[in-house]
From Swiss-Prot:
InterPro entries: Ribosomal_bL32 (IPR002677), Ribosomal_bL32_plant/cyanobact (IPR044958), Ribosomal_zn-bd (IPR011332). It holds the Pfam family Ribosomal_L32p. The lineage of its organism: Eukaryota, Viridiplantae, Streptophyta, Embryophyta, Tracheophyta. This is Large ribosomal subunit protein bL32c. It comes from Capsella bursa-pastoris. It comes from the Eukaryota.
Length: 52
């Protein structure tokens, strides 16, 4: 079984954590933007059936 040789420094741990958080932020921003475009009817990537 692989065992890490040395303890990861606090700064490296913080950098990795921030990268992980940033990915989540951008994903949520994209999802919000897509939801907004769907609700306003400006979406070019989805075909939404509108009931009249």
């Amino acid at each position: 079984m692989a065992v890490p040789k040395k303890r990861t420094s606090i700064s490296k741990k913080r950098i990795r954590k921030n990268i992980w958080k940033r990915k989540g932020y951008w994903t949520s921003l994209k999802a919000f933007s897509l939801g907004k475009s769907l609700s306003t009817g400006n979406s070019k990537s989805f075909f939404v059936q509108q009931n009249k």
